[in-house]
Amino acid sequence: MSKTIDVAKYLIYAYEQISNSRFEMQELKLQKLMYFAQRESFALTGEPLFPSDFEGWVHGPVLVELRYFFEQDYVPYNGDSSALSETDKYIIESVINKYGQYDAWYLRNLSHEEMSWKNSRDGLDDSEVGNRIISNRRY
């Protein structure tokens, strides 16, 4: 299993623990929370939280690896967080505390304010499909 998947599973677990509500297989919300977690990791540590790259899609940053996350034999977090450091968990939980209360569309709109996403969409119409990589250096 990739670290990106480990982070996504822990993020869902942390969301459910912190908010005391189900995540309900919200792919759009997962994508945006993962984006903000990656951004937060760069801000706090100078390093990525996970190795996967985001692409600049119409509805914001997307991890292609997670595109069908809930549809492909999704198995929830099982309590094994050995792939994640305490710093990783702190970053994820901080993002949940800061952004978890917002719905997917609010987070989508918030991600559209990010320069990294704007740069990945440069020259594209609002509805035009795009798949430019959002470089880790652009966060």
Locate the predicted segments by residue.
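Domain-edge interaction signal
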Residues: 1-139
